Amino acid sequence: MSKQDVIEVEGTVIEPLPNAMFRVELQNGHKVLAHVSGKIRMNFIRILAGDRVMVELSPYDLTRGRIVYRYK
């Protein structure tokens, strides 16, 4: 899957889950299960409930995503 195939949306972290997973509510009201991307993990960026994040969704499974950016 190339970079141009992903769907980028903004959302808010509702709750942290085990194994670096998070439940994120998107701006359109949908709730997705998202994991942290490798670059965020490498740079030790903490993500807490209430944070605004950018999520990449695959067009094949719109219920799961990857957190690629945490807004300040």
UniProtKB/Swiss-Prot annotation:
Disulfide bonds: none annotated. SMART domains: S1. The keyword Nucleotide-binding does not apply. It is found in: Cytoplasm. Pfam families: eIF-1a. InterPro entries: NA-bd_OB-fold, RNA-binding_domain_S1_IF1, S1_domain, TIF_IF1. Gene3D superfamilies: Nucleic acid-binding proteins. GO terms for cellular component: cytosol. Keywords: Cytoplasm, Initiation factor, Protein biosynthesis, RNA-binding, rRNA-binding. GO terms for molecular function: ribosome binding; rRNA binding; translation initiation factor activity. PROSITE patterns: S1_IF1_TYPE. Its main location: cytoplasm. Residues 1-72 form the S1-like domain. Belongs to the IF-1 family. Component of the 30S ribosomal translation pre-initiation complex which assembles on the 30S ribosome in the order IF-2 and IF-3, IF-1 and N-formylmethionyl-tRNA(fMet); mRNA recruitment can occur at any time during PIC assembly. One of the essential components for the initiation of protein synthesis. Stabilizes the binding of IF-2 and IF-3 on the 30S subunit to which N-formylmethionyl-tRNA(fMet) subsequently binds. Helps modulate mRNA selection, yielding the 30S pre-initiation complex (PIC). Upon addition of the 50S ribosomal subunit IF-1, IF-2 and IF-3 are released leaving the mature 70S translation initiation complex. This is Translation initiation factor IF-1. It comes from Pelotomaculum thermopropionicum (strain DSM 13744 / JCM 10971 / SI).
